[in-house]
Every structure is written in C-alpha cells, then in structure tokens.
Amino acid sequence: MILNEIFIKLFFMGMIFVVFSCATIKDEHYALIETKKGKMIVKFFPDIAPKHVESFKALIETDYFNGTTFHRVIPGFVIQGGDPNSKDNDRFNDGMGGHAGKYFGIGDENNSETWTVPAEFNEKPHKRGILSMARSQNPDSGGSQFFICVDNVPQLDNNYTVFGEVISGLEVIDKIVNSSTPGTENPSYRGPDRDNPIEKVEMNISLISSSELDLESLQ
C-alpha cells in the first residue's frame, strides 16, 4: 500500500516536471532577422541582460524594426542597425534615432522617444555573432540600435551590453558586411554615410518560440 502511494506521488511529480519543462521550452523566444541577404536566428541572454532583452522584444512586438536597415557595415568589426531613421531616404540621419521599448526610469515616462536602457555590462565576450547594444558615450543611452559582431572585437568587452547571439545564419553577416558602401567605392570619402550600404539592406524582425525553431530550414 505504501509502495503504491510512493509510486503514485512519484508519477505525478514526474508529470508536473514534464509539464513545467515543456512550458519553459515553449516560452523561450528567439529573434528571426530576415533580410534580402538571408535569415539569422538570435538567442537571447535574459539572465545577464534582462532589461535589454525585454526592451528588444517589446520593440519587435510592435514591428518597430520592420523596414529599418543595417546602416553601418564595417568588415572585421560589426554590422549595425535598428534605427527608425533608416526607413526614410535621408542617408545622413541614419544612426541618430531610436529609443527603448519600455520605460526603465530614464527619460520622460510620458514620452517614449526619450526612453533608454541602463547599461548591463557583463562578462560575455564580443566574439563573432554576438548581439550587443549600440550607445553614445553615455553608458545608459541604449535605445533601439544594435550591432552584431563580424569578428572577435575584445576592445568592446565590458563597454557595451551583450544580450544575445546569432546561432544560425552567420554567413548572412558576411554577406551584409561585404555590401558596397561609399567608403569601399571611394576610400577617401569621409561623409557620415561612409559605411552605409549603397543598396539598402532592410530587415524584418519577429519573435519565434523554440517549438517553431527549425534551424535546418534556415540553412
């Protein structure tokens, strides 16, 4: 009788564990970045940069990034994007816009255009494929602009907030960074759009759950 009771308890404990595990897996989200150069899948790091992940997801859920471009591409360094200014035809204002997806105590709570994300510097190295937050000289000025490392760039470690990593589509990074820019066409050019692709590399970003994740179909 006692053995039966123990078995029943263990059985239900196992069921609870399975259900909890499935729910946890189902709730984990990834970012799907789609461009004409290909697709990338990004895994988030909410354990080390919870505010950055929360802000980025909030912006994705409002289609904020759709139609923005990778406006800064530097071989051996990074590709940068996420600025809503890049949706217009003025190349010279790219890299000057964007805001956080949620109010984190910085800026005017009633004006989302002023929202930024406080720094969450961590020990994750800026290696190839890492997703990190762009900012001004103010550490707490992260908004919507982000960059993906093309190569290992240790000089950025502990100076910018790493909050994700490309786990599929690294070759797409290479295609984007090799786009023709005013700087590659004319090395002496020093305009503000020097590293901005001549032919726009637009993106759409959406959230997908782990149950929807199919890495093979993205190759």
Task: Please identify what each model-predicted range represents.
Residues M1-F11:
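Bacterial N-terminal signal peptides that target proteins for export
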